[in-house]
């Protein structure tokens, strides 16, 4: 059973910026399930998409892999000779735990977990690239360049899977979706204090875009098609095909 997330359950005098440290890594499976609506569906479908798009003798990347949920879903689904998965995360706590989880089961599809900044990783001969709730934590000025690098490293016909929290230009719609997300967290046992303190900790480090901004970025870079394939409240996932 996952360790329960109680990080923000007691009053914090000075709330610092949210970081993916040892405390977060320890409770991350519980935190993510109780915080992101539809997370399990997204993870399952990433495996389905990887099964469809992974090619023999190609690389599959999970950028910002955290504890490897998407990596493991893809490994279970991919059955292509010479295909390998490369997971990358800059949190040493996440990488250490991810390696343990990956090594707990053997598979014909090799997996390498790297501790690195995803902006510094070479993307080469890729058939699938996953950014699962990762891009939103990069500085907005760095996002286009990373996606350009991913595009350059993808094979023609390759797929980028981008899961994100969204904001919406319609103020009323945006507020409703935020409120529904908070209702979701309440229904999963988070208190008003936890919701408030987590929001304060994360508001300066997670800066979401609109769906239109994502689509324009894909189009400007040269992806031939892109679309939202999953959305629940203000969270969702898109694909972009080279």
UniProtKB/Swiss-Prot annotation:
<dbReference type="GO" id="GO:0016743">
    <property type="term" value="F:carboxyl- or carbamoyltransferase activity"/>
</dbReference>
<feature type="binding site">
    <location>
        <position position="39"/>
    </location>
    <ligand>
        <name>S-adenosyl-L-methionine</name>
    </ligand>
</feature>
<keyword id="KW-0949">S-adenosyl-L-methionine</keyword>
<dbReference type="InterPro" id="IPR005271">
    <property type="entry name" value="CmoA"/>
</dbReference>
<feature type="binding site">
    <location>
        <begin position="89"/>
        <end position="90"/>
    </location>
    <ligand>
        <name>S-adenosyl-L-methionine</name>
    </ligand>
</feature>
<comment type="subunit">
    <text>Homodimer.</text>
</comment>
<feature type="binding site">
    <location>
        <position position="199"/>
    </location>
    <ligand>
        <name>S-adenosyl-L-methionine</name>
    </ligand>
</feature>
<comment type="similarity">
    <text>Belongs to the class I-like SAM-binding methyltransferase superfamily. Cx-SAM synthase family.</text>
</comment>
<dbReference type="Pfam" id="PF13649">
    <property type="entry name" value="Methyltransf_25"/>
</dbReference>
<feature type="binding site">
    <location>
        <begin position="64"/>
        <end position="66"/>
    </location>
    <ligand>
        <name>S-adenosyl-L-methionine</name>
    </ligand>
</feature>
<keyword id="KW-0808">Transferase</keyword>
<dbReference type="GO" id="GO:1904047">
    <property type="term" value="F:S-adenosyl-L-methionine binding"/>
</dbReference>
<feature type="binding site">
    <location>
        <begin position="117"/>
        <end position="118"/>
    </location>
    <ligand>
        <name>S-adenosyl-L-methionine</name>
    </ligand>
</feature>
<comment type="function">
    <text>Catalyzes the conversion of S-adenosyl-L-methionine (SAM) to carboxy-S-adenosyl-L-methionine (Cx-SAM).</text>
</comment>
<dbReference type="GO" id="GO:0002098">
    <property type="term" value="P:tRNA wobble uridine modification"/>
</dbReference>
<feature type="binding site">
    <location>
        <position position="132"/>
    </location>
    <ligand>
        <name>S-adenosyl-L-methionine</name>
    </ligand>
</feature>
<dbReference type="InterPro" id="IPR029063">
    <property type="entry name" value="SAM-dependent_MTases_sf"/>
</dbReference>
<protein>
    <recommendedName>
        <fullName>Carboxy-S-adenosyl-L-methionine synthase</fullName>
        <ecNumber>2.1.3.-</ecNumber>
    </recommendedName>
</protein>
<dbReference type="InterPro" id="IPR041698">
    <property type="entry name" value="Methyltransf_25"/>
</dbReference>
